[in-house]
């Protein structure tokens, strides 16, 4: 956790390269080894995860969320006829994995609950209109909703530039509707 909330969460790559994650978090190794042939991604799942962790503030819940947000992708990877990779259902599986791993590592229930909810909803489509923002606020609560906006921003920034401006503008509109 100290590494995750440090100024250098990217050092997770060193833990992977030296074989440490293979022992303490083997699920991370599978992420590092899973490529994403998709216009929205430049990096393997693991490198995308590292970049996403670097995009959020040094907060335990946010960094853990980014660590786990795509952990289900290796198990959900499919490739279509055009050679494009898809990961349908990965958010739900990632949330389940996050809960199991955080429990295994003896995290407190509050952290487990927040991280699991954020991971499960990180790809949730929220239309920037009052009706849909209210619905998301009711479903998630204000604290999780605001954290989710940070998670979504970090996720976009760690992807390719494909539609990045459009995605970021939508997040700005979501925040404006909320405020």
Which sequence ranges carry the predicted segments?
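Histidine/acidic-rich helix-loop-helix segments that form or flank divalent-metal centers
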Residues: 36-46, 50-54, 107-165
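Charged substrate- and nucleic-acid-binding regions of tRNA-handling and nucleotidyl-transfer enzymes
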Residues: 99-104, 158-179
